[in-house]
Design a protein with these regions (language model features):
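Conserved catalytic core of nucleotide-sugar-dependent glycosyltransferases
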Residues: 102-168
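A short, glycine-/small-residue-rich helix N-cap motif at loop->alpha-helix starts
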Residues: 62-73, 160
Length: 271
């Protein structure tokens, strides 16, 4: 049997992430992949990216991206071809944390499979999460054509690009084994009110921890939900909730969104 070609891809546009995130991602991959691998970043800014990363221009797109919660610019990766890579590729979000060996993500299932993480926030829907997913280059091209025909209509129907992939990938999708990928907000942070007393835990069998929406790894490391909140004590956070929005639901939502610092992130999310 031929050796599996280990190809990582990621995508970067705008100013939210950039070279620091790309470089950390490469370093985490290098520490957790056995043998040779490549990492290709499709980006609009190569400045500061370490030389081991193969930088390619963003795949061309003539689509006006819809107004939606979904990260629809990822659809650029559904093109029939991608510069510099072919065959199965493992896509990684720039803001995830790799905490264990990645080798299994390259040979799990069949080379032609589309494999996603499970989204634990909607357990009855069986929704996939594209924070870490594998697909053969070109297999999702039919989805790109459907999306191109009516971008806003598709976004209105599915909201998230990962729901569109889950429901429409040719041949269907598979999921990674549950223990491999953990969702920080729902599977690491203790439930309210214990999150005020217990720091987020790293499950022993987790290989990757994903950070959809908020918080981001650097904020979770410091113990805050978003940068604008600053570093608050328990008491300061509670008082902010009490003095905040008048609507009870918004106050309670703010009250629940509290984190203690998460030091294990620094152990893994580094160059």
């Amino acid at each position: 049997m031929a050796a599996v070609k280990k190809q990582i891809i990621c995508i970067n546009w705008g100013t939210k992430y950039g070279a620091p995130y790309i470089n950390r991602l490469y370093a985490m991959c290098a520490r957790n992949i056995t043998g040779a691998f490549t990492m290709t970043c499709f980006t609009d800014n190569r400045e500061g990216v370490r030389p081991e990363v193969i930088c390619q221009d963003l795949p061309p797109s003539d689509i006006v991206m819809p107004k939606s919660k979904g990260i629809w610019p990822k659809s650029r990766l559904w093109n029939e071809t991608l510069d510099g890579v072919e065959g199965p590729v493992l896509f990684l979000d720039l803001d995830l944390v790799i905490t264990g060996n990645l080798d299994g993500f390259f040979d799990y299932g069949d080379p032609d499979d589309v494999i996603l993480a499970r989204n634990p926030t909607t357990p009855f829907e069986k929704l996939g999460q594209t924070s870490i997913f594998r697909f053969p280059v070109g297999k999702l091209a039919p989805l790109l054509e459907i999306f191109r025909a009516d971008p806003q209509g598709i976004a209105d129907e599915y909201t998230f690009e990962q729901r569109f992939v889950t429901r429409n990938a040719p041949g269907g999708i598979k999921f990674w084994p549950k223990p491999w990928v953990r969702h920080f907000r729902t599977q690491c942070v203790p439930l309210f009110p214990m999150n005020y007393f217990i720091a987020p835990k790293l499950p022993a069998d987790a290989r990757v921890v994903i950070f959809p929406a908020t918080p981001n790894p650097p904020d979770a490391l410091r113990g805050r939900w978003v940068p604008e909140e600053g570093d608050r004590t328990r008491g300061e956070h509670i008082m902010r909730a009490i003095r905040g929005p008048r609507h009870f639901d918004k106050r309670f939502r703010h009250l629940r969104r509290f984190l203690l610092p998460t030091p294990w992130i620094a152990d893994h999310w580094r160059e």
